[in-house]
């Protein structure tokens, strides 16, 4: 890996983090697709500014609670518990996607996205020191770029085969892989 400049002892953690970020970004893209499609079929687009403001307010509370609950905790433990919570909650929302659960999904997908990416970069920062990060973080970010391409191209065939109502299960799958 001389082109990428990764030392032999860094290969395994770099590869794992690459695929972890690939999975997180894939979950984000598939989840956002479901969130947007379901919301915009049931609610007028004029409600989007309200959703954006609500997300900001909710995230302020979530971040404060997150900091309190995770202080001093092992990052891998936090990611594992969060991944389980995210997967279970999305599964429950999937089975109740009507009425007020649609805006809840819209907001919750943003919470899942922000916390997952936040947790990933904290973990990457714990694994690699600043010197290593300068060399390796570009590769990790590429995992997200590949996910953008893969998920972007893969959503249409997935929906054609399994139906749009099952796209949230793909999101749950990617969250599970990322843990």
Model-derived regions: residue spans:
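Pair of pore-lining "gating" transmembrane helices in MFS-fold secondary transporters
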Residues: 7-38, 104-111
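Short extramembrane helix-to-coil loop segments that connect adjacent transmembrane helices in Major
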Residues: 40-47
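Cytoplasmic membrane-interface "Motif A"-like loop-to-helix N-cap segments
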Residues: 71-83, 161-170
């Amino acid at each position: 890996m001389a082109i990428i400049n990764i030392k032999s002892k860094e290969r395994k953690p770099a590869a794992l983090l690459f695929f972890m970020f690939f999975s997180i970004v894939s979950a984000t893209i598939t989840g956002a697709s479901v969130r947007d499609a379901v919301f915009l079929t049931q609610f007028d687009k004029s409600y989007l500014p309200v959703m954006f403001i609500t997300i900001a307010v909710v995230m302020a509370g979530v971040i404060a609670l997150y900091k309190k609950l995770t202080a001093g905790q092992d990052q891998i433990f936090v990611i594992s518990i969060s991944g389980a919570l995210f997967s279970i909650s999305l599964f429950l929302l999937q089975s109740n996607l009507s009425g007020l659960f649609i805006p809840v999904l819209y907001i919750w997908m943003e919470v899942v996205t922000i916390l997952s990416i936040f947790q990933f970069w904290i973990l990457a920062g714990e694994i690699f020191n600043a010197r290593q990060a300068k060399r390796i973080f570009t590769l990790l970010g590429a995992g997200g770029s590949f996910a953008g391409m893969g998920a972007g191209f893969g959503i249409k065939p997935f929906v054609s085969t399994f139906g749009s109502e099952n796209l949230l299960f793909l999101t749950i799958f990617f969250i599970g892989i990322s843990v």
